[in-house]
Amino acid sequence: MISSSKRDELIVSKIRKGTVIDHIPAGRALAVLRILGIRGSEGYRVALVMNVESKKIGRKDIVKIEDRVIDEKEASLITLIAPSATINIIRDYVVTEKRHLEVPKQIRGLIKCPNPQCITNNDVEAESRFTTISIKPLKLKCEYCEIYITEEDVIRQIL
């Protein structure tokens, strides 16, 4: 007979090289794929695990992408919708780099201000700049027009 802990395990094969994004809040894996521009026809082998138990955050999603390493801009965007996420870089089936994401104090040029009157929406040269007010829940303040945006606003922009 299989023990309870063995029955509850979810097995997804290891990847030889690529990226594993772990500890994504449940239900956010599809938004992560959207950030990465993965729609399914790019040729990457992708494993998507959604809504599994996690000791760290209750329920979580996991994304594994073979033969793809994410860049800093992508990691910064993922941080905004999954601040508890961990990015693992895999080489020869071994984690060679592990990064715990953190929401930065300043966010520049990654997202747009939703205020149509904001200078960043009316001047091509103006780069959006936000200050992080809180992380849980995510609350950002535009440095130009002082409007506040939430995690849900960021997700709407991504989707």
UniProtKB/Swiss-Prot annotation:
Keyword Metal-binding appears in the UniProt entry? yes
Pfam (any one)? PyrI_C
The residues that the entry says bind Zn(2+) are: 113, 118, 142, 145
User: Residue span of the signal peptide, if any?
Assistant: none
Cofactor annotation remark: Binds 1 zinc ion per subunit.
Q: The organism sits in which domain of life? A: Archaea
**What cofactor requirement does the entry state?**
Zn(2+)
- Gene Ontology terms describing biological process: 'de novo' pyrimidine nucleobase biosynthetic process; pyrimidine nucleotide biosynthetic process
What's one GO-annotated cellular component? Answer: aspartate carbamoyltransferase complex
Sorted alphabetically, the keyword list is: Metal-binding, Pyrimidine biosynthesis, Zinc
State the InterPro entries in the record.
Answer: Asp_carbamoyltransf_reg_N, Asp_carbamoylTrfase_reg, Asp_carbamoyltrfase_reg_C, Asp_carbatrfase_reg_C_sf, Asp_carbatrfase_reg_N_sf
Q: Which GO terms describe its molecular function?
A: metal ion binding
| Subunit description | Contains catalytic and regulatory chains.
Which HAMAP family does this UniProt record tie to the protein? Answer: Asp_carb_tr_reg
Return the similarity comment: Belongs to the PyrI family.
Q: What does this protein do?
A: Involved in allosteric regulation of aspartate carbamoyltransferase.
The protein's name is Aspartate carbamoyltransferase regulatory chain
Species whose genome carries this gene: Saccharolobus islandicus (strain L.S.2.15 / Lassen #1) (Sulfolobus islandicus)
